[in-house]
Amino acid sequence: MDVVNQLVAGGQFRVVKEPLGFVKVLQWVFAIFAFATCGSYTGELRLSVECANKTESALNIEVEFEYPFRLHQVYFDAPSCVKGGTTKIFLVGDYSSSAEFFVTVAVFAFLYSMGALATYIFLQNKYRENNKGPMMDFLATAVFAFMWLVSSSAWAKGLSDVKMATDPENIIKEMPMCRQTGNTCKELRDPVTSGLNTSVVFGFLNLVLWVGNLWFVFKETGWAAPFMRAPPGAPEKQPAPGDAYGDAGYGQGPGGYGPQDSYGPQGGYQPDYGQPASGGGGYGPQGDYGQQGYGQQGAPTSFSNQM
């Protein structure tokens, strides 16, 4: 009991509410319906043979058949209408292969769904370890989807043949006494095959479930990551018109307005306003505008002379 309690306490039951676990529950339930409706079937048909000699007639002949539908082994006794004798009439066909294949796939799908669901709940860490669990789950799901397609299609064809072989009208056509003049053969009851029809429906529903579950298992494998495109990034912001002068702004390094050593550290116009060119710019303590001027090479000596 302690082990059971620990498993229950450590179980991640929320996975049942997620698509991966919820679909697995549906697969488990639908697999039960598929093999139960087919594997437990028992059918019966009735017919009558009325001979010219009324005393030899059989007015209620019951013929039973069941899964796995080896109809060639099913027979019934019918009056031969000749001197009180009877004749064994065998049904035609062996449809056990398609029926047994369908039931086998359903049973294994039931067992796998139950095991996978238990793994999702109680062994989630082991399931995701090294990504082997999702990959094996995906391959198994793909195989079962294919097997459901094949088995359901084969059983649908087999069921059609079973209906033909158990139709009282077709059986009567093969009975020799019914072809004799004076004898009358009638069908009294057709077999009820609604349960078998339901099994075919559940087979194709299982096919839909297993094919649909491929996507949810595929996402768990991580194989979808290369195909998942990242959302486009935000467009690059264009600089505002005011930023054309540079990021530094006024008076802050290159690109700004500021007084960067007058107009440059070397050459060009250097307003020294009262100091020699080698002493740097500025107003300086030596005189006013008229002293030293711009320089010594043929330029005006002061602002007053230029005026």
UniProtKB/Swiss-Prot annotation:
Topological domains on the Cytoplasmic side lie at 1-19, 126-132, 219-307
What GO molecular functions are on record for this protein?
Answer: cholesterol binding; identical protein binding; protein domain specific binding; protein-containing complex binding; SH2 domain binding; SNARE binding; syntaxin-1 binding
- What topology does it adopt in the membrane? Multi-pass membrane protein
> What ranges does the record list as Low complexity composition bias?
259-276
Residues of the MARVEL domain: 15-222
Q: Where in the cell is it found?
A: Cytoplasmic vesicle, Secretory vesicle, Synaptic vesicle membrane; Synapse, Synaptosome
| Coiled coil ranges | none
Query: What domain notes does the record hold?
Result: The calcium-binding activity is thought to be localized in the cytoplasmic tail of the protein.
Description of how the protein assembles with itself and partners: Homohexamer or homotetramer. Interacts with SRCIN1. Interacts with VAMP2; the interaction is inhibited by interaction of VAPM2 with SEPT8.
Full protein name: Synaptophysin
Taxonomic lineage: Eukaryota, Metazoa, Chordata, Craniata, Vertebrata
